[in-house]
Regions:
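Intrinsically disordered, polar/acidic, low-complexity terminal segments
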Residues: 6-9, 13-212
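Cytosolic-side transmembrane helix boundary signature
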Residues: 1-4
Length: 213
């Protein structure tokens, strides 16, 4: 084979395979979480199991593609009524399979960010941050109040990490996440979190929490 052929394989087919394998691995972990929820609900003789929909990580190109078919007709297969909820825009399996940074950063009153995960989803894909809250912030904040989150790095850089106050409940845990470029958990010094008034833009609560690894 020519040098050009080898170069094409390296630049296209190998990265494509790595991305596809990574996506399959993520889906497998999500399946384990869903089935654990279902098994527990059946063991407890519940009428319904609430499971998150799949989050499908992107692959390099349209084909091969992951089978995104997901129907509540699966209830017949599992023998229990299934309610499938939105998964968010992050790989929630990370929050069940990897050690978090425990931070206990206050948003307001009795609402806290308990912990967070920072991960690079796949080669060439943005870094993601997942936050776990002790409760759904939306239940404690009125329509005129939003929350803010930012990181401060050891060299003084401020990185915006805002997420919506409406979080995703997965197996009794309140999670939210977003993509953030250029963030490294080893370089983080503190997290600033709190609330602000959407009418005036003024901060109504601000808290700084040191990040200790």
């Amino acid at each position: 084979l020519s040098v050009t052929t080898y170069a094409m394989a390296f630049l296209y087919f190998i990265p494509s395979y790595i991305l596809y394998y990574s996506s399959i691995k993520s889906i497998s972990k999500q399946t384990e979480i869903r089935e654990e929820i279902i098994d527990r609900a059946k063991h407890n003789k519940q009428d319904q199991a609430i499971i998150p929909d799949y989050y499908f990580p992107p692959v390099l190109h349209a084909g091969p593609s992951l089978d995104t078919f997901n129907s509540e007709a699966m209830s017949r297969y599992y023998g229990i009524d299934l309610k499938i909820t939105a998964p968010g825009f992050f790989d929630y399996s990370r929050a069940f399979n990897f050690k978090p940074l425990n931070i206990n950063a206050k948003i307001c009153n009795n609402v806290y960010i308990k912990s967070l995960w920072i991960y690079k989803q796949q080669m060439g894909i943005k870094t993601f941050v997942i936050f776990e809250f002790n409760k759904n912030p939306a239940d404690s904040l009125d329509e005129n109040t939003a929350m803010f989150i930012s990181f401060k790095t050891k060299d003084g850089k401020i990185i915006n990490a805002d997420v919506d106050k409406k979080t995703f409940q997965i197996d009794g845990r309140w999670l939210s996440g977003r993509a953030i470029n250029g963030i490294d958990s080893n370089e983080l010094e503190s997290i600033t979190s709190g609330t602000w008034d959407v009418r005036t833009g003024a901060r109504t609560n601000e808290n700084i929490t040191e990040i200790i690894k």
